[in-house]
Amino acid sequence: MYSSTTPDEDRKHARLMANILDIRYIEVSIDTISNEFFNITDTENIKKLDYINEDIFKVASGNLKARIRMSLLYYYANLKNYIVIGTGNRSELLIGYFTKYGDGGCDIEPIGDIYKTQLRILAKDWGIPEDIISKPPRAGLWPGQKDEDEIGLSYDKLDSLLYMIIDKNMDNDEIIKNIDLSIEEINRIRSKIVNSRHKVESPQSPRTSGKLI
């Protein structure tokens, strides 16, 4: 499910992996759907009247693309009585680096407990082509978009930090002795972990009985 901002290389790699794994696939452009959405919602006038800046629109339109893809995946899954498999890894899920009800919308997360850096090692064992393993991670939601630019850290540093915070329960004084990051950078990631919990938890509901649903 590609758009005008999907790098050609990514489409080529998707086809390559489908062929390697002998998976039947179809390619669907989501541009018509997203453009029609912008027309129906009168997005251009809303941007002018409400003074919505381009950075906010960029993120909102990127999230829309992810949610369109999720809707299409579930449509095809319903037709075939399939489940939807997620692609989120532990690094992304812990800091909320995914679109709620977009790429985060799935039935199972097979690699959800594996850090990005661990996946690179596993990918070599699984025979994934080196071109795919070594290219910069990106979602292609807008031109030039790259994961590590948005996160503000390389995955190597992020995974080391997450391991110390989550798996080892280390405080900042301990962490800073073991990694070349500032207190501000460490706290920024801690905030992402806390502030994104709603993305991986069921919606909260007022308790009016003694039993949970």
How would you label these PLM feature ranges?
Residues M1, I30, N89, K135, ...:
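Proline- and acidic/polar-enriched loop/turn elements at helix boundaries
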Residues M1-L94, I175:
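ATP-dependent adenylation/nucleotidyltransferase module used to activate substrates
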Residues E9, V59, I68-S71, I114-Q118, ...:
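Conserved active-site and cofactor/substrate-binding residues in soluble primary-metabolism enzymes
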Residues R11, F38-T41, Y97-F98, P143-D147, ...:
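Short secondary-structure transition/capping segments
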Residues N35-E36, L94-I95, G140-L141, V194, ...:
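Short secondary-structure boundary/hinge segments and terminal tails
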Residues E54-L64, I83-S160:
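Catalytic subdomain that performs nucleotidyl-dependent activation
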Residues G104, Q145-I213:
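Peripheral terminal appendages
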